[in-house]
Amino acid sequence: MRTLWIMAVLLVGVEGSVIQLGKMILQETGKNPVKYYGAYGCNCGPLGRRKPLDATDRCCYMHKCCYKKLTDSNPIKDSYSYSWENKAIVCKEKNPRLKEMCECDKAVAICFRENMDTYNKKERINTKIFCKKTPEPC
């Protein structure tokens, strides 16, 4: 519960793609992004990449890999242009660097929706103590 509170505090007043990512997740899944994915499994949240526990956790793993490929981007400060059209995320950003960030966020939001059947409530707030530190390569 403490982790969830900390994640909520971190998101308050934050601008940039972190907020846009949360909106995308809400639009794609209908779920509160902080509550359902803020500390899920071994890869969702601020800690480094670890071996994914399930398909939902793999979504976060792949999102971190996607962000790792970005150069000169700051997901906390940078924001991009996107819209929700006909129940689909459309990245409208002209800046190539920010468009890539938008595409990373879009991919994880869609991944969460496509893997909702693998979501394990027991992993919602994972302390990551028992997560294997050797991740697969991106």
From Swiss-Prot:
<comment type="subunit">
    <text>Monomer.</text>
</comment>
<feature type="disulfide bond">
    <location>
        <begin position="91"/>
        <end position="102"/>
    </location>
</feature>
<comment type="similarity">
    <text>Belongs to the phospholipase A2 family. Group II subfamily. K49 sub-subfamily.</text>
</comment>
<comment type="function">
    <text>Snake venom phospholipase A2 homolog that lacks catalytic activity. Induces mild local edema. Is myotoxic. A model of myotoxic mechanism has been proposed: an apo Lys49-PLA2 is activated by the entrance of a hydrophobic molecule (e.g. fatty acid) at the hydrophobic channel of the protein leading to a reorientation of a monomer.</text>
</comment>
<keyword id="KW-0959">Myotoxin</keyword>
<dbReference type="InterPro" id="IPR016090">
    <property type="entry name" value="PLipase_A2_dom"/>
</dbReference>
<dbReference type="GO" id="GO:0006644">
    <property type="term" value="P:phospholipid metabolic process"/>
</dbReference>
<dbReference type="GO" id="GO:0047498">
    <property type="term" value="F:calcium-dependent phospholipase A2 activity"/>
</dbReference>
<dbReference type="Pfam" id="PF00068">
    <property type="entry name" value="Phospholip_A2_1"/>
</dbReference>
<dbReference type="GO" id="GO:0005576">
    <property type="term" value="C:extracellular region"/>
</dbReference>
<feature type="disulfide bond">
    <location>
        <begin position="59"/>
        <end position="111"/>
    </location>
</feature>
<feature type="site" description="Important residue of the cationic membrane-docking site (MDoS)">
    <location>
        <position position="124"/>
    </location>
</feature>
<feature type="disulfide bond">
    <location>
        <begin position="65"/>
        <end position="138"/>
    </location>
</feature>
<dbReference type="InterPro" id="IPR033112">
    <property type="entry name" value="PLipase_A2_Asp_AS"/>
</dbReference>
<feature type="disulfide bond">
    <location>
        <begin position="42"/>
        <end position="131"/>
    </location>
</feature>
<dbReference type="GO" id="GO:0005543">
    <property type="term" value="F:phospholipid binding"/>
</dbReference>
<feature type="signal peptide">
    <location>
        <begin position="1"/>
        <end position="16"/>
    </location>
</feature>
<dbReference type="GO" id="GO:0090729">
    <property type="term" value="F:toxin activity"/>
</dbReference>
<feature type="disulfide bond">
    <location>
        <begin position="44"/>
        <end position="60"/>
    </location>
</feature>
<feature type="disulfide bond">
    <location>
        <begin position="66"/>
        <end position="104"/>
    </location>
</feature>
<dbReference type="InterPro" id="IPR033113">
    <property type="entry name" value="PLipase_A2_His_AS"/>
</dbReference>
<keyword id="KW-0800">Toxin</keyword>
<dbReference type="GO" id="GO:0050482">
    <property type="term" value="P:arachidonate secretion"/>
</dbReference>
<keyword id="KW-1015">Disulfide bond</keyword>
<feature type="site" description="Important residue of the cationic membrane-docking site (MDoS)">
    <location>
        <position position="121"/>
    </location>
</feature>
<dbReference type="GO" id="GO:0016042">
    <property type="term" value="P:lipid catabolic process"/>
</dbReference>
<feature type="site" description="Cationic membrane-docking site (MDoS)">
    <location>
        <position position="128"/>
    </location>
</feature>
<dbReference type="GO" id="GO:0005509">
    <property type="term" value="F:calcium ion binding"/>
</dbReference>
<protein>
    <recommendedName>
        <fullName>Basic phospholipase A2 homolog Tpu-K49b</fullName>
    </recommendedName>
</protein>
<dbReference type="InterPro" id="IPR036444">
    <property type="entry name" value="PLipase_A2_dom_sf"/>
</dbReference>
<feature type="region of interest" description="Important for membrane-damaging activities in eukaryotes and bacteria; heparin-binding">
    <location>
        <begin position="121"/>
        <end position="133"/>
    </location>
</feature>
<keyword id="KW-0964">Secreted</keyword>
<keyword id="KW-0732">Signal</keyword>
<dbReference type="InterPro" id="IPR001211">
    <property type="entry name" value="PLipase_A2"/>
</dbReference>
<feature type="site" description="Cationic membrane-docking site (MDoS)">
    <location>
        <position position="133"/>
    </location>
</feature>
<feature type="site" description="Hydrophobic membrane-disruption site (MDiS)">
    <location>
        <position position="130"/>
    </location>
</feature>
